[in-house]
Design a protein with these regions (language model features):
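Bacterial N-terminal signal peptides that target proteins for export
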Residues: 1-8
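Soluble, non-membrane globular domain cores that form compact, hydrophobic packing
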Residues: 21-114, 120-190
C-alpha cells in the first residue's frame, strides 16, 4: 500500500510540474548587444567592393604609393605619411591615432572617388576632424560632390568623398554590406 501511495504521489507531482511547464518566476535580465565590428579596415572595403557588378566597377586602385593594389582595395602602410595626409586628407596631428588603414580610389582622378577606412581610438573625434579636413580642402582637377563618414564597431571609421555617380552606388553597397554601420555624415561638399 505504501508503494502505491508513493507512486500516486510521484504521479501527481509530475503532472503538477508538467502543468506549470517547469517555469520559475525569475526576473529577466537583458544585456545590450555588442557590435563586434569588422576584422580589419581592408575587410570593410573588400566586402563593399565585392558587391559591385563588373558593369558598375570603376578603374580603381587601393593601398598606397609603395604598395599599390590594382583594381581592388588595399592596405595602407602607415609609414607612408605623405599618402595619408595628401591623398586621404588625414591631418598630420591625427596620424598618431590611426593604427590601421585601407584605401580604395578612382585610379584616374582621386577627386572622383576616394575612400579610406581607419581604426582609431576615438571615433567621434576622428570623424569630426575628417569632416573639417575634407570640407575645408582646396580641390584641384575636379571637385567631389558628396562626403560620407560612417562608423562600425571596433573603432573603424570610413571616410569617402567623390562625385555622385561614384558615391551613390558606393553608399548603397556600404549599407547593404553593413546595415548596422552608423552613418555619421552624408552631405554635399560645398
Amino acid at each position: 500500500m505504501k508503494k502505491i501511495t508513493a507512486l500516486l504521489l510521484v504521479l501527481v507531482m509530475t503532472l503538477s510540474l508538467a502543468a506549470c511547464n517547469g517555469t520559475t518566476n525569475t526576473p529577466e535580465t537583458t544585456t545590450e548587444p555588442t557590435v563586434a565590428g569588422p576584422a580589419s579596415a581592408l575587410e570593410v572595403l573588400e566586402t563593399i567592393w565585392a558587391l559591385y557588378t563588373d558593369d558598375n566597377k570603376f578603374f580603381a586602385m587601393g593601398g598606397d604609393y609603395e604598395t599599390p593594389v590594382d583594381g581592388a582595395p588595399g592596405a595602407v602602410n602607415l609609414a607612408v605619411k605623405d599618402f595619408l595626409t595628401y591623398s586621404l586628407l588625414i591631418p598630420e596631428a591625427e596620424l598618431a591615432g590611426v593604427t590601421e588603414a585601407a584605401s580604395l580610389m578612382h585610379a584616374m582622378n582621386a577627386n572622383s572617388f576616394t575612400c579610406g577606412v581607419y581604426k582609431v581610438a576615438d571615433v567621434a573625434a576622428f570623424a569630426g576632424t575628417m569632416e573639417t579636413a575634407v570640407m575645408g580642402n582646396q580641390w584641384m582637377c575636379g571637385f567631389p560632390e558628396t562626403l560620407v563618414i560612417a562608423s562600425f564597431g571596433g573603432g573603424y571609421v570610413l571616410v569617402a568623398f567623390g562625385v555622385n555617380d561614384a558615391m551613390n552606388p558606393f553608399l548603397t553597397n556600404l549599407q547593404t554590406a553593413y546595415p548596422a554601420a552608423e552613418l555619421l555624415v552624408n552631405k554635399p561638399i560645398a
